[in-house]
Amino acid sequence: MTQDELKKAVGWAALEYVKPGTIVGVGTGSTAAHFIDALASIKGQIEGAVSSSDASTAKLKSYGIQVFDCNEVDELDIYVDGADEINSQMQMIKGGGAALTREKIIAAIARKFICIADASKQVDVLGKFPLPVEVIPMARSYVARELVKLGGLPEYRQNVLTDNGNVILDVHNLTILDAIALENKINNIAGVVTVGLFANRGADVALIGTADGVKTVELK
């Protein structure tokens, strides 16, 4: 199976977790796009969705799925999204698609976080994939200097603004052994909106696409 076929398999497998009559949290990226395709097949059974990006919102609306503002929703039953990396503790690096802040907000209000990913995203130690940090533009240089102090090599993501109007620093050269501590440390730097470490709020279930089919991993 190609990587895209693996992504499609996990996107459709996530339908099993969608309960009728609920509002579904939907992520961003190529794997989440397959989940939106799948969700469209049962759109008459759900109330609608909350979306983590303008791109996902447009795709949901193109299928006629109602998209709710996050402020209209107290709690979501599930949030389904991909990951750039996921470890055995269900901690993730996310934000390759620059939607990390909205993704983190939706994850916070969801009872269950379903991570959908192909097997290439599974790692023993987080950090090979550059860690995205969303930063208020005027703080870019200061935050970059602080990230260097933490051992990182931050790179300004050129010509990219988040849906919130901020910039992204991608931090290379990290071996993340304590993801919760690093998430807290980076989030405390003035000017950081959020870091793409999902460790304090990791995944509850991971659906991993492999050549042998979709494997389900649950947080122990």
Swiss-Prot record:
GO CC terms, sorted: cytosol
Catalytic activity: aldehydo-D-ribose 5-phosphate = D-ribulose 5-phosphate
Enzyme class, spelled out: isomerase
Protein's pathway: Carbohydrate degradation; pentose phosphate pathway; D-ribose 5-phosphate from D-ribulose 5-phosphate (non-oxidative stage): step 1/1
Enzyme Commission code: 5.3.1.6
One GO MF term: ribose-5-phosphate isomerase activity
Cysteine disulfide partners in this protein: none
Database matches in InterPro entries: NagB/RpiA_transferase-like, Ribose5P_isomerase_typA_subgr, Ribose5P_isomerase_type_A
Active site residues of this protein: E103
One GO biological process term: pentose-phosphate shunt, non-oxidative branch
Residue sites binding substrate per the record: T28, G29, S30, T31, D81, G82, A83, D84, K94, G95, G96, G97, K121
Alphabetic keyword roster: Isomerase
Quaternary state and interactors: Homodimer.
Job description of the protein: Catalyzes the reversible conversion of ribose-5-phosphate to ribulose 5-phosphate.
Family: Belongs to the ribose 5-phosphate isomerase family.
Protein name: Ribose-5-phosphate isomerase A
Encoding gene per record: rpiA
